[in-house]
């Protein structure tokens, strides 16, 4: 069993938001082909953000169907473009009602895979300095803490923790040098 990660799929099977304008020609088929070559049913695939361009959860079915039909268990985390994201309960209910069985979410919670705890959150741009950015960063830090604590409480403190984030946790501005 292996763990894979891929983010920023920006799927748009139900909406007209083609990614070929960014040079992503035929990218859905390329994702599918590579996924089928590498991932098997017992593997875990982490999708830390920007999964779908949809604005509402009820419009995401075709995007979820695409990954549901690929092998492996999928765990999604929120990205900055996942405007369809809702409460954990609503998202899980949607998956259940649509019979999408091998997908789940990390959102103030955790997941156990083999001997690992999977935790995470979206994160935020740590270099941004506005008041709203500060609030978002503080909230995301709390979500990360909740996710890690949840994993330790549910699965034990002796297991290694894999943390997923949509925004990399950079601690300094590399554009300034040094």
Task: Please name every model-derived segment.
Residues 2, 15-113, 176-178:
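Core catalytic region of metal-dependent phosphoesterases/phosphodiesterases
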């Amino acid at each position: 069993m292996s763990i894979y990660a891929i983010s920023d799929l920006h799927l748009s099977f139900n909406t007209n938001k083609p990614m070929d304008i960014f040079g992503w020609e035929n990218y859905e088929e390329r994702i599918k082909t590579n996924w089928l070559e590498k991932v098997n049913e017992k593997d875990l695939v982490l999708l830390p953000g920007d999964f779908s361009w949809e604005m509402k959860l009820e419009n995401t079915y075709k995007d979820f169907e695409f990954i549901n039909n690929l092998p492996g268990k999928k765990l999604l985390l929120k990205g900055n473009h996942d405007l369809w994201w809702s409460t954990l309960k609503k998202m899980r209910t949607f998956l259940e009602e649509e019979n999408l069985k091998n997908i789940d979410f990390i959102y103030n919670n955790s997941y156990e895979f083999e001997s690992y705890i999977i935790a995470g959150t979206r994160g935020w741009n740590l270099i941004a300095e506005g008041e709203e950015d500060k609030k978002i960063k503080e909230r995301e830090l709390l979500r990360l803490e909740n996710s890690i604590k949840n994993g330790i409480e549910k699965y034990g403190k002796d297991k290694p923790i894999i943390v997923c984030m949509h925004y990399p946790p950079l601690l300094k501005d590399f554009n300034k040098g040094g």
